[in-house]
Amino acid sequence: RIRYFSALIFLLLFTSNIFAKKNPNIVYIMSDELAYFELSHMGNKYIKTPNIDQFAAEGIRFTSALAGAPVCAPLRCNLMTGKHAGHASIRANDGGTPLRENETTIASMLKQIGYETGGFGKWGCGGRDSTGVPEKHGFDLFYGYYDQVHAHSFYPSYLIQNSVEVELKGNKGGRTGQTYSHYKIMEAGLNFIRKKKDKPF
């Protein structure tokens, strides 16, 4: 009986210690068409990426993995859902196939354990009025491009925040304009992190 009682006390102390710890913040970076050695921590002598290098030094690097698909939208679906390409809802890069309704994503799983979730940049898993928009798959906030074809312009006339168009002043959707979209996306991401600094994100 003493042995079982001691084991029970240990278990209670162990589990209370787990729940007392704060969940770590997660910054998940995905980049299209980035070669393995283009980052300076991988040995590139010409391109300097000190902030990403710091993430690599202090965080987790996945170095033994294969891409689930060779093109944008299917790969994004694989990474968001954790599914093999043969089971994923998005298998082509046509920009029209969305995530299925109620599809589990990394964001929806993190929401279940108390995380604030934000996505910034290119989504590629479903356009507005589809089952695949980010806010239907666990994201509190998404700001950027829903459609990867829309992302082919650095100066689009608008970006999207939770299915609502946000106008970018001085842009007509061409190769030049007044508002560089990536600066706006970066600002939105940094603002999200600053506002959520006291909660796990």
Question: What do these predicted regions represent?
Answer:
Residues R1-K22:
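Bacterial Sec-dependent N-terminal signal peptides
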Residues S16-F201:
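Formylglycine-dependent sulfatase
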